[in-house]
């Protein structure tokens, strides 16, 4: 009996890491804001309850593709990161790296830190909502597993038509 429960737990936790693929159109519709920017800094921190690690990334906004953002710098927060010898990796989350040029599909969120009233953004669709812009001008996304909808996903998109 306990072996069956262990197997069911394992299967359910594995299944939760697989998502349905989202097209660029679906990501755009689900997002309040879509931006092109550069990652200025990343800072891991403990959640308020001290049970998990989240990372806050400071992003300099270069272009607003959809929506309105009045500030030139925003904070994007996502689960995972490393503090000292402790690290948390989350399946289907593509960590942001300092100096990275990116396109992000975002929605407003609440910070997991103690800072009250800090306005943060979360990435829509986990890793699907992050494109890394290469030196060739192509924005690429990776780092996620999908159960269905592969045909809908645009893994590579040209940046120029987006930033008119």
Protein language model features and the residues they cover:
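Transition segments tied to proteolytic processing and entry into folded domains
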Residues: 2-4, 8-164
């Amino acid at each position: 009996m306990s072996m069956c429960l262990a197997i069911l737990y394992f299967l359910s936790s594995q299944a939760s890491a697989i998502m349905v693929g989202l097209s660029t159109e679906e990501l755009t519709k689900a997002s309040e804001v879509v931006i092109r920017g550069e990652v200025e800094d990343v800072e891991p921190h403990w959640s308020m309850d001290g049970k998990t690690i989240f990372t806050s990334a400071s992003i300099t906004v270069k272009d607003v593709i959809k929506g309105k953002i009045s500030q030139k710098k925003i904070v994007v927060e996502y689960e995972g990161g490393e503090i000292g010898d402790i690290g948390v990796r989350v399946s289907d989350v593509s960590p942001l790296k300092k100096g990275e040029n990116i396109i992000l599909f975002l929605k407003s969120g609440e910070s997991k830190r103690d800072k009250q009233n800090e306005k943060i953004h979360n990435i829509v669709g986990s890793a699907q909502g992050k494109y890394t812009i290469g030196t060739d001008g192509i924005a690429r996304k990776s780092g996620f597993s999908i159960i269905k909808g592969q045909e809908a996903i645009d893994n590579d998109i040209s940046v120029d038509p987006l930033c008119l």
